[in-house]
């Protein structure tokens, strides 16, 4: 605990209560009389790692969505409900990662099969 209340690392993007470091994830104010447990509960919102059950639900939703894309020739409009389920089951950062990973895996699959066609700008250079 810092001299004026809970001390949290600025390198992690959070606040030192008395000095005014802030994070947009805080749900309330942190003053000199804020108990450490209260201040930490503000920080913990949205920060906890998913449990094993939550990870399994996320991966299952991702797999169902990817399967739908495969079955519908990448037509995302046919998989809107599964996309919504995927987005509500996984942390946003994971969704970005999984989307990029799928793009890479599809590119790699085409490249290894000799089906990769460079864009016109790449072919001209």
Swiss-Prot record:
UniProt key word Ligase: no
Compartments (UniProt record): Mitochondrion intermembrane space
Motif (Cx9C motif): 58-68
GO cellular component, one term: mitochondrial intermembrane space
InterPro entries recorded: COA6, COX6B-like, CX6/COA6-like_sf
GO molecular function: copper ion binding; RNA binding
GO biological process terms, semicolon-separated: mitochondrial ATP synthesis coupled electron transport; mitochondrial cytochrome c oxidase assembly; respiratory chain complex IV assembly
Record keywords, A-Z: Acetylation, Disease variant, Disulfide bond, Mitochondrion, Primary mitochondrial disease
Domain CHCH: 55-98
Cx10C motif, short sequence motif: residues: 79-90
Origin: domain of life: Eukaryota
Record-annotated disulphide pairs: 58-90, 68-79
Disease: Mitochondrial complex IV deficiency, nuclear type 13: An autosomal recessive, infantile disorder with a fatal course in the first weeks of life, characterized by hypertrophic cardiomyopathy, left ventricular non-compaction, lactic acidosis, metabolic hypotonia, and mitochondrial complex IV deficiency.
Function description: Involved in the maturation of the mitochondrial respiratory chain complex IV subunit MT-CO2/COX2. Thereby, may regulate early steps of complex IV assembly. Mitochondrial respiratory chain complex IV or cytochrome c oxidase is the component of the respiratory chain that catalyzes the transfer of electrons from intermembrane space cytochrome c to molecular oxygen in the matrix and as a consequence contributes to the proton gradient involved in mitochondrial ATP synthesis. May also be required for efficient formation of respiratory supercomplexes comprised of complexes III and IV.
Family of this protein: Belongs to the cytochrome c oxidase subunit 6B family.
Quaternary structure and interacting proteins, as annotated: Interacts with COA1. Found in a complex with TMEM177, COX20, MT-CO2/COX2, COX18, SCO1 and SCO2. Interacts with MT-CO2/COX2 and SCO2. Interacts with SCO1. Interacts with COX20 in a MT-CO2/COX2- and COX18-dependent manner. Interacts with COX16.
Protein name: Cytochrome c oxidase assembly factor 6 homolog
């Amino acid at each position: 605990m810092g001299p004026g209340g809970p001390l949290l690392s600025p390198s992690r993007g959070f606040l030192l209560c008395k000095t005014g470091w802030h994070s947009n994830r805080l749900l309330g104010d942190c003053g000199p009389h804020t108990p450490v447990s209260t201040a930490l509960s503000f920080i913990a919102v949205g920060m906890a790692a998913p449990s094993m059950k939550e990870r399994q639900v996320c991966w299952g939703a991702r797999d169902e969505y990817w399967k739908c894309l495969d079955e519908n020739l990448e037509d995302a409009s046919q998989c809107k409900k599964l996309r919504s389920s995927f987005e509500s089951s996984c942390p946003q950062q994971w969704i970005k990662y999984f989307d990029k990973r799928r793009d890479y895996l599809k590119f790699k699959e085409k490249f290894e099969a000799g089906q990769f066609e460079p864009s016109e700008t790449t072919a001209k250079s």
